[in-house]
Amino acid sequence: MAPSPQQDAILTLDGVVAGYGKMTILNGVSATIRRGAITTVIGPNGAGKSTLFKTVFGLLGVRTGRVTFDGADTTSFEPRRMLDAGVSYVPQGRNLFPELSVRHNLELGGVALSDTSRLAGRMDEMMARFPMLRDKANAQASTLSGGQQKLLEVARGLLLEPKLTLIDEPSIGLSPLMVQEVFSILKDLRSAGVSILMIEQNARQALAISDYGLVLEQGQTRIEDTAQNILADPRIAQLFLGGGLAPATSETSR
């Protein structure tokens, strides 16, 4: 069941403009990401989805507009400050050190923890939550399957107990069975109180486990609604077939 409209926001974007060099990718994105929910961002290639995540996490500067996380203005925050504030980021693709062990790769997610006892405790918690990582703790990361590597990246992102996790295309290169496992873990994280903002190419499957959805096109928010309503919107089928979205109506766009 989707959270109520009164549920408070953990992240808001207000007219955010960002890009690379002279190229503008995000052209006034506004959105509200609800606390304790899974929100999936979809849209055609080049819509600005990954750029949105990089901007929220502080990897890319905001030219104009405002980003607010958990009630604080984080528009100018760099990645380390976003980590400290409670945001983790799992980028697209493989982002592990293949020659290091599973345990060492996981420990790298806790570089911001100065308390070694707390780090040890969080490591134990992650090993318990992800039994596969415990069983392969001393194996090189390069020996893991694609799905296992993705689970390791997710676990590493959770080591600092984030309030919000940004996950970019978690299903890329995974078998259908492993995709189901990853999505099941995301649902468990939501139940544990972690807010999740996800980009996913398998939009229908992702929206099926999501509470909310956000459709981007040409660097702008075109639809922001419950996942259920987006799944039922006939314009989404046109988007998936490669066409643009028709002008949004007041019933499904806000």
Walk through the language-model features, giving the residues of each.
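ABC ATPase C-loop
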Residues: 157-158
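Conserved ABC ATPase signature
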Residues: 140-144
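The feature captures the beta-strand-to-loop junction immediately N-terminal to the Walker
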Residues: 42-44
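Helix-to-loop junction immediately C-terminal to a conserved catalytic motif
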Residues: 57
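ABC-type ATPase nucleotide-binding domains, specifically the catalytic core motifs of the NBD
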Residues: 21, 39, 61, 102-121, ...
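Conserved ABC transporter NBD signature motif
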Residues: 65-73, 85, 119-123, 225
